[in-house]
Amino acid sequence: MSFSVAVAGASGYAGGELLRLLADHPRLEVQTLTAFQNAGERLRQVHPHLTSYADRTFVETTAERLAGHDVVFLALPHGKSGAITAELDDQTLVVDCGADHRLVDEAAWDAFYGGDFAGAWPYGLPELLHAEEGGTQRTRLSGVKRIAVPGCNVTAITLGLQPGIRAGVIEPEDIVAVLAVGPSGAGRSLRTNLLASEILGSASAYAVGGTHRHTPEIRQNLETAGGGHVSVSFTPVLVPMARGILATATARLAPGFSAHDVRAAWELAYADEPFVHLLPEGSFPNVSDVTGSNTALVGLAIDEAAGRVVTVTAIDNLVKGTAGAAIQSANIALGLPEAMGLPVNGVAP
């Protein structure tokens, strides 16, 4: 049995990555591709790399076009999902790759996004640890009909730090995260600061001083994992790589814990995870190791002089950071094998 799929916003980077991954999925069948300004164009004009869809045509993005499918993936700009979702049947599985339904706290939404608060949906990070109820988020995704996919930066920081927060081996205050990110995370719209002539040979910090929209979502996740208040200073740095995130995060080592205790916490958290892997001691990931894959690689060290734990996490922002997480979560919701249709191996060189 196959499930019929519509991808809204299929002309963008996230939408295109959804199509690339879904092309090899044995149970999810893409029937409808929608776009805004690209409606009416053939897919090969926008995504020439997606040969299997080359002669398909984008249709306009309306609730009417999306209705009647078993699964609808939304890869739309922030603020565009709520109105469309309200018109879809509540038995349709809707997976939103935008930010509209990620935050639980309405005040945080108002402070960082603004506009109408659409409410939180079940969160699409299966590996997210839960301090109070125990277990992981995957048990809370089974059978749901609405899923909010995490922000890509949020996923990288959460996967890097949550084992230590959950085990209490790192302090939840004074966490610092600096992320090297590629421009595809900002979407496909033309912006001067994302031009090759501006990016190549350079690097630039942005949203400095806790102003990035992913900040409250990072806190939300780490507080879910740890059960208490968390403070995080998060700074993204735009670097000249098309895709990928390398997240370097540090936190104070909690009193009374050793390097052995720290490593044991990460090993326990990720021992059975299909897509999150702790690297051997002394090894740290490269972004190129995970390109094109749904895998997250985590390196771990102790800075003895500073008394801090250091994690380095690499993900592909378009796969594990967006489209892969969407499909992984949809698999769980539909009762399919969690890893179905998702690549574990990266592409090299």
Curated annotation (Swiss-Prot):
Q: Does the keyword NADP apply?
A: yes
Pfam families from the xrefs? Answer: Semialdhyde_dh, Semialdhyde_dhC_1
Q: What is this protein called?
A: N-acetyl-gamma-glutamyl-phosphate reductase
| Primary residence | cytoplasm
Q: Where is the active site?
A: C152
**SMART domains in the record:** Semialdhyde_dh (SM00859)
User: Which CDD domains does UniProt cross-reference here?
Assistant: AGPR_1_actinobacAGPR_like (cd24148), AGPR_1_C (cd23934)
**What reaction does this enzyme carry out catalytically?**
N-acetyl-L-glutamate 5-semialdehyde + phosphate + NADP(+) = N-acetyl-L-glutamyl 5-phosphate + NADPH + H(+)
Top enzyme class:
oxidoreductase
GO terms for molecular function, please? N-acetyl-gamma-glutamyl-phosphate reductase activity; NAD binding; NADP+ binding
Keywords, ordered alphabetically: Amino-acid biosynthesis, Arginine biosynthesis, Cytoplasm, NADP, Oxidoreductase
Q: Which GO terms describe its biological process?
A: L-arginine biosynthetic process
